[in-house]
Amino acid sequence: MAVLQVLHIPDERLRKVAKPVEEVNAEIQRIVDDMFETMYAEEGIGLAATQVDIHQRIIVIDVSENRDERLVLINPELLEKSGETGIEEGCLSIPEQRALVPRAEKVKIRALDRDGKSFELEADGLLAICIQHEMDHLVGKLFIDYLSPLKQQRIRQKVEKLDRLNARA
């Protein structure tokens, strides 16, 4: 397994729309494993393949406290959503920045697991929010897209400054 490089804004590759996975095979399983390793190394709770410059419809999530409840979503489809909620969200591609984002309270999705088996899942709370956040990545959407242009600009400037400082270190 390997830790992959996470893209940061304003990298335009984050805006690419991911293509469906045609076959869940050993290569896709390796990507899933590398994505989990990357997500845990970065202390995230979710990661979309587009964030690591792999433009396929793959998401990994683990919102558990013990980091032992892995969820793999390959080619996820949103079937239903209901209610309204929102929390301050963060993103590995937008380091050290958070903002309140409106989301559905509950979602029902269909996806393939790591072995290519189809399943449906109903989620609420943090898991539902995380699923929506990561599914946005697959269509090139970031949480800052829900914010005003001024807030977007401020966050971009902060991330660019942080990346410059980290490049010097």
UniProtKB/Swiss-Prot annotation:
UniProt entry tagged with the keyword Iron: yes
SUPFAM superfamilies listed in its UniProt record: Peptide deformylase
Its EC number(s): 3.5.1.88
Catalytic activity, as annotated: N-terminal N-formyl-L-methionyl-[peptide] + H2O = N-terminal L-methionyl-[peptide] + formate
Keyword Disulfide bond among UniProt keywords: no
GO annotation, biological process: co-translational protein modification; translation
Matching NCBIfam families: pept_deformyl, PRK00150.1-3
Protein name in UniProt: Peptide deformylase
Lineage: Bacteria, Pseudomonadati, Pseudomonadota, Gammaproteobacteria, Enterobacterales
